[in-house]
Design a protein with these regions (language model features):
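Structured-RNA-binding interfaces characteristic of tRNA pseudouridine synthases
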Residues: 2-226
């Protein structure tokens, strides 16, 4: 059954739109981005491209909140963001519109309308970084932007043993100088899980934590490889 409401009073089109909170899951190739966050120097960033697309769609500046910031050259398989906007659009319309305005190295995998209290950063339970090592005598032209080439022998047994020492809560204060802005509140992070797998010449390291300091994931991998 369709119901149509009729009013003799003039309708305010803005007042007729409700505030919505959209949660988006992104995938992106970070090769040509200077990280997630918008830079004052105007470098190309993921957040910058997202907000440019939203400006095209909604004709106004939209503040985007991310679950975390990725550094230059870091890719994402499931970055979660959210933004609030007064709109009649539904999730699939937002996804379609953003896809038409975004470059090919950013993909919107999913869009949901969530409660107004949802916050991509504060409601994130954990974050997982995947570090991929190509462990053979020669590099890969095809995969060079998606792995770290390491031609020397790696002792996986020792690596897994060293990984256990990082599990649990640790104070990474030694990273504070390199990440002064992000570490000004707390340098304590909880490493929940480290999973190391090898298939053929590929070693994959998944590190799950409640948060990461600047390039801490790289330092952890290097320490485990020593």
């Amino acid at each position: 059954m369709n119901v149509k409401a009729i009013s003799k009073k003039p309708v305010n089109p803005i007042a007729n739109k409700s505030i919505k909170n959209f949660k988006l899951t992104l995938e992106y190739d970070g090769t040509d981005f200077n990280g997630w966050q918008i830079q004052s120097q105007g470098e190309r960033t993921v957040q910058g491209e997202i907000q440019k697309a939203l400006l095209q769609i909604f004709k106004q500046e939209v503040n985007v909140i991310s679950s975390g910031r990725t550094d230059a050259g870091v890719h994402a398989l499931g970055q979660v963001i959210n933004f609030k906007i007064r709109s009649r659009m539904i999730p699939r319309e937002v996804q379609k519109a953003m896809t038409s305005f975004l470059p090919s190295d950013i993909v919107i995998k999913d869009v949901q309308e969530v409660g107004l209290k949802f916050h991509a950063q504060y409601d994130a339970i954990s974050k997982t970084y995947r570090y991929t090592i190509l462990n053979r005598a020669y590099a890969s032209a095809k995969e060079r932007n998606f792995c770290q080439f390491y031609p020397y022998k790696i002792n996986l047994v020792r690596m897994r043993h060293e990984a256990k020492s990082f599990l649990g809560k640790n104070d990474f204060k030694s990273f504070e100088a390199a990440d002064h802005e992000r570490a000004k509140h707390s340098t304590v992070r909880q490493i929940k899980k480290i999973n190391i797998r090898k298939k053929d010449n590929w070693i994959t390291i998944d590190i799950e934590a409640d948060g990461f300091l600047y390039k801490i994931r790289i330092a952890l991998v290097l320490l485990m490889c020593l």
